Amino acid sequence: SWRDSIGDFSYGAKFVLSDDQQVITNYPNDSKSLDIAHYSGKKLNSIWGYTTVGIAQSQEEMDAHIANNRPSWGSNWSAGDIMYADLNGDGVVNSGANTVDNPGDRTIIGNSTPRYKFGLTLDAAWKGIDFSVFFQGVGKRDYWLSGPYFWGASGGMWQSAGFKQHWDFWRPEGDPLGANLNAYYPRASFDGTKNQYVQSGYLQNAAYIRMKNIQLGYTLPKQWVSKAGMSSVRVYVSGDNLLTISDITGIFDPETLGGAWG
């Protein structure tokens, strides 16, 4: 923290930073099965997932890809679908034995523990006028979002959502809505959730900085308020959560994300 003054002008700053990680040293899961939530040596909140190659731009590209990288789930893979990477070179994309030692083509792609949590307060005052602003945030955090609120089109009409962000889905040349080959989301489909497996390409960067509060006030001179029988009067305007900087999709609030993954 810091505080100083120059004549009638005073100012100050306060910064708080914290960080923590947790590792499980011993857990009754000798096989280190990933079907069980925890295992010895696990860094808490690790996110296991597949590696995203990209969105197939043509049927030919998808056919060539799945010839050597065929997912063990889903069918009718086509242009606009996700291409997953076969990391172990066996020609199939799967979770192997689903253990730490044999996770197939999954790896630890992130961690949802909030890291480098911080708060910054700045304030100043001059001849009865005061100003303060408070920022808070998280310096590093990965987060996996799932379900229709993130993906939009999902397992069926009644399991889907339609926010403006979801319009950025892949569309081919000649589509009535216009082509969108550089889309964020894969093609819209009610055909299951084969494009929505936990994967690197859609892992969210949940780090953020938010202006939690900003306030401007004025304390009336004592000679004014004493005539009304009062000792002090301060008038002020205040605003909360007026600015947030984050890479996470705008559908979600990085400060109020649910429980940690893993």
Which stretches of residues belong to each language-model region?
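Conserved small-residue
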Residues: W2-N111, G152, D168-P176
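Membrane-embedded beta-strand positions of outer-membrane beta-barrel proteins
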Residues: A13-F15, V133, V235-V237
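Outer-envelope beta-barrel architecture signal
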Residues: G7-A13, Y116-F118, K127-I129, A207, ...
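Extracytoplasmic gating/loop element in the C-terminal half of outer-membrane beta-barrel translocons
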Residues: V138-R234, S238-D240
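Membrane-embedded beta-strand positions in outer-membrane beta-barrel channels/transporters
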Residues: S1, G12-K14, G119-T121, N213-G217
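Outer-membrane beta-barrel proteins
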Residues: G7-S10, Q22-P28, K140-S146, G156-M157, ...
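Transmembrane beta-strands of outer-membrane beta-barrel pores
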Residues: L17-V23, W126-G128, G137-R141, N213, ...
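Repeated loop/turn-to-beta-strand initiation elements of outer-membrane beta-barrel proteins
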Residues: G128-S132, Q223-W224
